[in-house]
Amino acid sequence: MEVRVINTYKEIRNYITRVKNGDSPALCWEEEVVSVYWEHLCCYAPFDLSERKPCVITDIAALERQCDLLEQLDVVTLAHEFERVTAILPNYDDDPITVVLFPSDNGNTTVNEKQNGVVGTSLFGNLYIQVNPLVTGYENWIRYVFAHEYHHTVWGNYWFMLHRGELDNKFIDSLVIDGEADSFAMELYPTLQPQWLFHLSEDEITCLWKERYSKIVNSTEVDYTTYMFGNEKQNIPWCAGYAVGYRLVQNYLAMSEKNVIEILETKPEILLYGLDTIRKI
């Protein structure tokens, strides 16, 4: 599958120039950075995805340093690696994929300290990855994040397009899609240890499953942000849903003796069948 990687450092420099000249950061960001690629990025999407646009960055000093480093990024090598990933997990069509690299806000301490300076967003085929080259080792995580987001593309193509209507929009779907995506990326890059999967002890995850997640997996009315990304006020740790989903998938893989690619077409609730005791998660 053809994968095209676009580095936006030139557009970012245009944005910086306009902001320094006194123009509105929000307007310039939209005109110089986002709108240049947004229509193409969303060309496969079945509905409007405007809420997923990358947010404006106003720290111009940091952005200038990021641009200098982004310009040095080898996008050709990245594209080859991304194509290797797509060959391991073929999609259900041959549509080419575009990956746009935007900078991430240097002021986002969560991304910098817990996500290695790299986050991705899937847009029903194409995707974008936000990177902070000021974070040490960020380059290694671009490929992991691509693998994770690309798995979303394939999973979504199967369940939301080819088999539309066969899922019941239960919370188990959310746990499984990210659990499988991280399982896929971890198999490709086993030396990388994402904090969002391993920041909690196994006892903590077991407790979360027993007291919280096992009670809501079949619900269609779940606060997604709280239970996937965490909520300190409700005692849900950061990214707890990712950690729980990953263990759920890993448990099923061990019991079924299948691999992570083979279970992509397995309905999410089936992954629960083996969880007859909390010990197994």
Functional labels for PLM-detected ranges:
Residues 2-4, 8-11, 166-208, 279-281:
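Post-HExxH zinc-binding segment in Zn-dependent metallohydrolases
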Residues 121-123, 130, 154:
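Hydrophobic, aromatic-lined core segments that form the binding pocket/scaffold
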Residues 214-281:
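Pan-zinc metallopeptidase signature
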Residues 62-124:
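Auxiliary, metal-adjacent structural segments of Zn-dependent hydrolase domains
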Residues 144-157, 178, 182:
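Active-site recognition of the HExxH zinc-binding catalytic motif
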Residues 136-137, 160-169, 190-199, 255-262:
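Inter-helical turn/loop segments and adjacent helix faces that build the functional surface
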Residues 131-146:
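Short pre-active-site segment immediately N-terminal to the catalytic Zn-binding motif
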